Curated annotation (Swiss-Prot):
Lineage of origin: Eukaryota, Metazoa, Chordata, Craniata, Vertebrata
Protein name: Feather keratin
Example of a GO cellular component annotation carried by this entry: intermediate filament
InterPro entries documented for this protein: Keratin
Family statement: Belongs to the avian keratin family.
Length: 98
């Protein structure tokens, strides 16, 4: 009969010449729409460096001052000309890099 001619759920074929109604119940459809991935780029820390060594006056006066502090055992942290401006730590035996 006509039930065998029922096509899949969807539009009815135009060539169906059967006089009996063709009824077929299809299952409910479920469509899952997933959002696309969103990439957010946050700026990282901005690192900048500035030279810390500054010299005022001549190098002789600076070195004399450092030796005076070193002879008294006073810690000295300064710019100076040594080790990229890191200064030194003066102990009883001399000036050591930090």
């Amino acid at each position: 009969a006509c039930n065998d001619l029922c096509g899949p759920c969807g539009p009815t074929p135009l060539a169906n010449s059967c006089n009996e109604p063709c009824v077929r119940q299809c299952e409910a459809s479920r469509v899952v729409i997933q959002p696309s991935t969103v990439v957010v780029t946050l700026p990282g820390p901005i690192l900048s460096s500035f030279p810390q060594s500054t010299a005022v006056g001549g190098s002789a006066s600076s070195s004399v001052g450092n030796e005076l502090l070193a002879s008294q055992g006073v810690p000295y942290f300064g710019g100076g000309f040594g080790l990229g401006g890191l200064g030194c730590f003066s102990g009883r035996r001399g000036c050591y890099p930090c």
